[in-house]
Amino acid sequence: FHAVSSFCNAGFDLLGGRFGAFSSLAGYNDNPLMLGTTAALIVVGGLGFFVWEDIVDKRCWSRLSVYSKMVLLITAVLIVGGALFFLMEEFDNPATLGDMPLWQKGLNALFQSVTLRTAGFDSIGQGGLSDTSKAMSCVLMLIGGSSGSTAGGLKTATVGVLLLALRSGLMGREQVTFRGRAIHYRRVLNAMTLALVVLFVFVFSSMVVSTVEDLPYLDSAFEVASAMGTVGLTTGITPTLTPFSQGLLILLMYMGRVGILSFSIAFITGNRHPAKIKYPEMNVMIG
């Protein structure tokens, strides 16, 4: 059950009767085998079947598609970067990693970084995280996993395209490129549109939950990001929410899993007709 839940990034567990309600994997926070195996299954499920098919067929880094290389690179950066961030930020926090030995702190920081990518298990109490860690958690939950996977979120490739577009803009390049390949401007525009829609819904929904429930904005944002990214983590306030807010979170879960996916498919497969009118260009002052 837990292996399937991990691979499918579901986050459901049967450990409540053993370690207490809503304990998740907290009872195993000193067990490298349990956390390591679970984290590995989460990563495998979150990479996407397209990437794994490419890996099985090519079996060599140099022969992998540019897309697979992008996904693997961004995934590695997010996991390692997230683990280092949580290790440093929560190092002395007694509510999370503070009372653990060094090796256990590193293990749980790594697991925290992995599980935020739409898995939903937790080995440390999310309610005890610092405000900075909660903010970073929101970012990782909104990013999610990779396209064609069991994970939700914006997807790693979308974030990769946005970062590459930022690099091209800062360097004054006319094309967005990655490893000798140019990314079509339409894909860049799609990524920007999708990111802006998700950001708007996230900010607005967080404001609504915060206002209705009279909760700190960051705690509300954590719940909303968890719902939109189909993660399932909570700081502990979900059972106390009113039916209105719980209903909103349910809608956000559907949007996070079905809505964003459908939105992406509409961009990719939508019928496009050549413009019958070509308008003259105009200059707009930016910044």
Residues of each region from the PLM?
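Membrane-proximal intracellular helices of multi-pass ion channels
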Residues: 1-287
